[in-house]
């Protein structure tokens, strides 16, 4: 392979004028043996221009990601798909670790992705040598090889981070080699605060973080001291930067936005990340699983106090206005939160708690300069930042809130102290408005514990009236927004004065409709919706204004693209379904325009937020459609708008649009629940085309819509053979293409629905096709009883459709592995699996099928062999049906939840300085604890499986109804008894064969079924 030719092609990809020709050259060359190793040689060569090396690294990364894993041809393909040749793989494996060590940072980033993919597919099977290779450089006295080898080791560790314990053996073996060296290396470097030293330390900590659950008590002590030292040591004021041509830099003069990225703060962040993770997951007695009980006790008593002492120092530094990076502060607060529940750590924390809450937590919860700057420069970005879940997760302010809430709930002195502190601020007319914002933020954060204590709950209405309502008209926009947020937080409060509630609703509505500041409008929208949800009278007050309110909500959504507001508008639509009727079409049109705008925006593909927002818009349209479903005139107008939205998604390539398929299929389902227009029948063909392009993953999402096509307008379905052909072809493709057993169950169910829906409607020509499709699937091995019984059920439905046709079909089906007709195999499988028919519909179908089987005029020979199983199987099915009918009578929907603003006290406080769960701690147990010997009563457990919740409550597929499930559908009790009586009168010998195996209990049960059938016949009532 000529390296110069590849170099020229790579150089061409950087030049827009040469890119197309260069890419064609590379695409014609990449399958040639030695191409990939040549790329790696180019990447590491310092004689090659840097941009070319970068381009080569990106190309190699893409090749490894796509073509490293062995791939077999898919069904129907003749040519084997391209894989990187094994000789080339060997060369890359041999040189990849060295390449990572030698290359600069931007190229390393591409190569580490390559290495992780290689390890994923080749370790340990094809590449056990990677461990020795990394260890060679890690043990080297040449410090220049340490960082690169640690990056390589990190890829190995990350591959195992989330694997089950039993799959981690190769990693455990490797870490026996690496852990001592990692500990030795970081200990050696701790006193060296230079950039490269701390960079290596940080990488060691990242590796350790991914291994935390594997560390035992023996080695933990050394690591705890290392972690404590890293957190405790000072960040150097001046550092020597090799990357900036040897210049000295002052850390304290770095821009504040850049300081968190300094390596010393990153190193502290990872040390704290480890400590917090250990405490939360493994070191907190009473909150750990059984295997960590001993370690949790050991951790709390041995390490927690020493670590917490260091963290108290970190918080004091922040309080004294010394710089602490946001993530370090956030992790510090998270660790302290965990310590609140334990007496040992609480006793150490308690003397400092008032200072922490008043002088550290409180300032974090106040409106800041950076908030004001962002609000003024970009209010929409301010909204996005305030509602971003990830930002919340890593925010010091959120961690401060969590610490405050936990302490207020768990330790009795915290809540009164904090409320008194906030009260003093609120009553002070000269208080800094930002401190007023902080006080309201604290009170809103503590709303839940405040509403649970009568002493505070009774004062909250007055507090809102005196301190919150006036600020809803403040000239400071951030105080108006905060006041709306407080009303949102206290929306469950039981108001004693109706005028106060009315005033709250009116003020919030005014801020929503009239305020000029978008962040205020967003908070007002959320507050109004929660008031309407929690206060019946608020719902009444807003009813006359619902049109301007909804229009304003749409305007805000259009302007801000804030996903939280799509949830608000959906809930308002459900609350005011009648009032929304007159504006439903306009709302849907507006939402469709917003959706189109989002999809066509330039930054759509780069912004995950826009995808989330677009999904929220589709969900809102779906809500309108659901609420308006039975209003025919409106639904017809909505259909055209919805079809435009559906078309917008389906016309684009599946890449980038697939995330919307579930939502647009839900829209199409909503448009077909009551009637199906010609336009919706045309959509079936479009969906079929989409399905053909690897959309098996979405078949289960298509299922409700396909069910509607079959059941809502069966006449139209049967009027044109292509409709039924399309649906059958989709089901057949799912059943023959390894789509997975869940989609296959759905495909079989749809075939059953078609058979039952079209019984007596002349689809005889379809029955052999349907039956052969499911039986062929059965012969290929089935893992789950659900798929097995579902395939059998299609054949049983065909038996119900036309017994003679079904038996004829079975006698004529031959599969390659067996020259015999499949009749005997099918009936034997059915007899063996009757106990796996669960739920009401499936058992009912099985009973009807067995009843028909008993009456067959021309009995297949296999029936003589299984005759003794037929009636006992039916009796077992009726036992299940009896339990289902009884449970449906007993388990009427209950009214859950207590009245809002409950008068009951709920005390979560821990007495005095005790632990939340006792000093020894209690392991978290599974929801059902074993009793006695594990092997005891095994037989009973097997029997009880037949009566588990799934068996009684039905199966998920039962939501796809058939004529059998209607109130006037076939009665299985009457059907079975009538069949057995006809057999008794027409063929006494066969009747004797059917009933003679029954024991006394079974005969009694049979008589009960006769009696119940008679009762149901005379009363016309089903169920018990």
UniProtKB/Swiss-Prot annotation:
Lineage, opening ranks: Eukaryota, Metazoa, Chordata, Craniata, Vertebrata
Keywords, sorted A to Z: Cytoplasm, Nucleus, Protein transport, Transport
InterPro entries listed in its UniProt record: ARM-like, ARM-type_fold, Importin-beta_N
Keyword Hydrolase attached: no
Organism for this UniProt entry: Danio rerio
Keyword Ribonucleoprotein: no
Record region (Disordered): 896-969
Family membership: Belongs to the importin beta family.
Compartments it resides in: Cytoplasm; Nucleus
Gene Ontology cellular-component terms listed: cytoplasm; nucleus
SMART domains, sorted: IBN_N (SM00913)
Described purpose of this protein according to its UniProt entry: Involved in nuclear protein import, either by acting as autonomous nuclear transport receptor or as an adapter-like protein in association with the importin-beta subunit KPNB1. Acting autonomously, may serve as receptor for nuclear localization signals (NLS) and promote translocation of import substrates through the nuclear pore complex (NPC) by an energy requiring, Ran-dependent mechanism. At the nucleoplasmic side of the NPC, Ran binds to importin, the importin/substrate complex dissociates and importin is re-exported from the nucleus to the cytoplasm where GTP hydrolysis releases Ran.
One Gene Ontology molecular-function label: small GTPase binding
Biased composition (Acidic residues): 902-917, 934-952
PROSITE patterns in UniProt: IMPORTIN_B_NT
Gene: ipo8
Phenotype of gene-disrupted mutants: Knockout animals present mild to severe dorso-ventral patterning defects during early embryonic development and display severe cardiovascular and skeletal defects.
Domain spans labelled Importin N-terminal: 22-102
Name this polypeptide is given: Importin-8
Gene Ontology BP terms: intracellular protein transport
């Amino acid at each position: 392979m000529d390296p110069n030719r590849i170099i020229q092609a790579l150089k061409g990809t950087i030049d827009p004028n040469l890119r197309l020709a260069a890419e064609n050259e590379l695409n014609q060359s990449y399958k040639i043996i030695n191409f990939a190793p040549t790329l790696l040689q180019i990447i590491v060569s310092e004689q090659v221009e840097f941009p070319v090396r970068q381009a080569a690294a990106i190309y190699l990364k893409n090749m490894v990601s796509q073509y490293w894993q062995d791939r077999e041809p898919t069904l129907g393909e003749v040519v084997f798909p391209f894989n990187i040749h094994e000789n080339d793989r060997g060369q890359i494996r041999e040189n990849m670790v060295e390449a990572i060590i030698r290359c600069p940072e931007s190229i390393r980033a591409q190569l580490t992705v390559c290495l992780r993919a290689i390890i994923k597919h080749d370790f340990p099977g094809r590449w056990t040598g990677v461990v020795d290779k990394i260890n060679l450089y890690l043990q080297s006295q040449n410090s220049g090889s340490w960082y690169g080898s640690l990056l390589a080791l990190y890829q190995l560790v990350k591959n195992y981070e989330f694997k089950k314990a039993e799959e981690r053996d190769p990693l455990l073996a490797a870490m026996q080699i690496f852990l001592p060296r990692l500990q030795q290396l970081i200990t050696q470097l701790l006193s060296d605060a230079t950039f490269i030293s701390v960079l290596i330390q940080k990488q060691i900590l990242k590796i350790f973080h991914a291994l935390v659950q594997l560390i035992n008590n023996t080695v933990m002590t050394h690591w705890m001291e290392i972690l404590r030292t890293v957190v405790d040591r000072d960040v150097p004021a001046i550092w020597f930067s090799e990357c900036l041509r040897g210049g000295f830099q002052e850390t304290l003069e770095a821009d504040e936005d850049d300081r968190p990225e300094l390596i010393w703060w990153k190193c502290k962040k990872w040390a704290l990340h480890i400590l917090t993770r250990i405490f939360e997951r493994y070191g907190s007695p009473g909150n750990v699983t059984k295997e960590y009980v001993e370690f949790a006790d050991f951790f709390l008593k041995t390490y927690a106090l020493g670590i917490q002492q260091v963290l108290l120092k970190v918080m004091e530094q922040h309080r004294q206005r010394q710089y602490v990076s946001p993530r370090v502060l956030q992790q510090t607060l998270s660790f302290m939160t965990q310590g609140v529940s334990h007496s040992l750590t609480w006793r150490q924390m308690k003397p400092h708690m008032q200072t922490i809450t008043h002088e550290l937590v409180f300032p974090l919860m106040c409106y800041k300069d950076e908030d004001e700057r962002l609000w003024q420069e970009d209010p929409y970005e301010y909204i996005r930042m305030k509602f971003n879940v990830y930002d919340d997760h890593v925010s010091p302010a959120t961690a401060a809130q969590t610490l405050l809430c936990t302490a207020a709930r768990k330790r009795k002195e915290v809540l009164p102290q904090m409320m008194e502190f906030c009260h003093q601020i609120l009553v002070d007319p000269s208080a800094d408005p930002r401190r007023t914002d902080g006080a309201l933020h604290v009170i809103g954060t503590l709303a839940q514990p405040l509403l649970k204590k009568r002493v505070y709950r009774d004062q909250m209405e007055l507090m809102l009236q005196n301190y919150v309502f006036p600020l809803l008209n403040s000239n400071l926009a951030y105080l108006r927004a905060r006041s709306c947020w407080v009303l949102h937080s206290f929306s469950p409060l039981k108001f004693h004065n109706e005028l106060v509630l009315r005033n709250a609703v009116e003020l919030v509505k005014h801020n929503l409709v009239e305020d000029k500041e978008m962040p205020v409008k967003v908070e007002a929208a959320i507050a109004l919706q929660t008031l309407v949800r929690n206060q019946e009278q608020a719902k009444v007050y807003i009813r006359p204004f619902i049109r301007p309110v909804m229009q304003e909500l749409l305007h805000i959504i259009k302007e801000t693209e804030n996903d939280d507001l799509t949830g608000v508008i959906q809930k308002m639509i459900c609350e005011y379904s009648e009032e929304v009727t007159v504006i439903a079409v306009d709302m849907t049109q507006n939402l469709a325009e917003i959706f189109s705008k989002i999809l066509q925006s330039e930054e759509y593909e780069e912004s995950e937020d826009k995808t989330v927002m677009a999904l929220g818009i589709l969900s809102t349209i779906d809500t309108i459609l659901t609420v308006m479903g039975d209003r025919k005139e409106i639904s017809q107008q909505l259909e055209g708008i919805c079809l435009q939205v559906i078309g917008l998604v389906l016309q684009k390539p599946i890449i980038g649009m697939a995330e919307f398929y579930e939502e647009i299929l839900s829209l199409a389902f909503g448009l077909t629940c009551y009637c199906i227009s010609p336009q919706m029948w045309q959509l079936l063909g479009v969906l079929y085309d989409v399905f053909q392009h690897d959309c098996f993953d979405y078949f289960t999402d298509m299922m409700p819509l396909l069910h509607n096509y079959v059941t809502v307008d069966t006449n139209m379905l049967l009027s044109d053979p292509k409709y039924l052909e399309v649906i059958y072809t989709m089901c057949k493709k799912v059943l023959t293409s390894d789509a997975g057993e869940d989609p296959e169950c759905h495909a079989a169910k749809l075939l059953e629905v078609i058979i039952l829906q079209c019984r007596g409607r002349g689809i005889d020509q379809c029955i052999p096709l349907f039956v052969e499709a499911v039986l062929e699937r059965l012969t290929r091995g089935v893992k789950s009883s659900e798929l097995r019984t579902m395939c059998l059920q299609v054949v049983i439905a065909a038996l119900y459709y036309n017994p003679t046709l079904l038996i004829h079909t079975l006698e004529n089906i031959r599969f390659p592995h067996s020259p015999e007709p499949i009749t005997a195999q099918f009936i034997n499988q059915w007899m063996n699996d009757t106990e796996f028919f669960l739920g009401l519909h499936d058992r009912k179908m099985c009973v009807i099928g067995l009843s028909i089987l008993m009456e067959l005029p021309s009995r297949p020979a296999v029936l003589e062999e299984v005759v003794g199983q037929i009636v006992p199987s039916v009796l077992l099915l009726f036992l299940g049906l009896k339990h289902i009918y009884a449970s449906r009578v007993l388990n009427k929907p209950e009214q859950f939840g207590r009245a809002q603003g409950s008068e009951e006290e709920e005390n979560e406080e821990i007495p005095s300085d005790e632990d939340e769960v006792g000093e020894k701690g209690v392991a978290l147990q599974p929801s059902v604890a074993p009793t006695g010997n594990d092997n005891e009563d095994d037989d009973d457990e097997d029997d009880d499986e037949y009566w588990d919740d799934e068996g009684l409550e039905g199966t998920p597929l039962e939501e796809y109804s058939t004529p059998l499930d209607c109130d006037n559908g076939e009665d299985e009790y009457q059907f079975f008894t009538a069949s057995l009586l006809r057999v008794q009168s027409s063929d006494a010998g066969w009747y004797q064969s059917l009933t003679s195996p029954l024991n006394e209990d079974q005969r009694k049960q049979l008589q009960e079924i006769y009696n119940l059938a008679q009762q149901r016949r005379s009363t016309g009532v089903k169920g018990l």
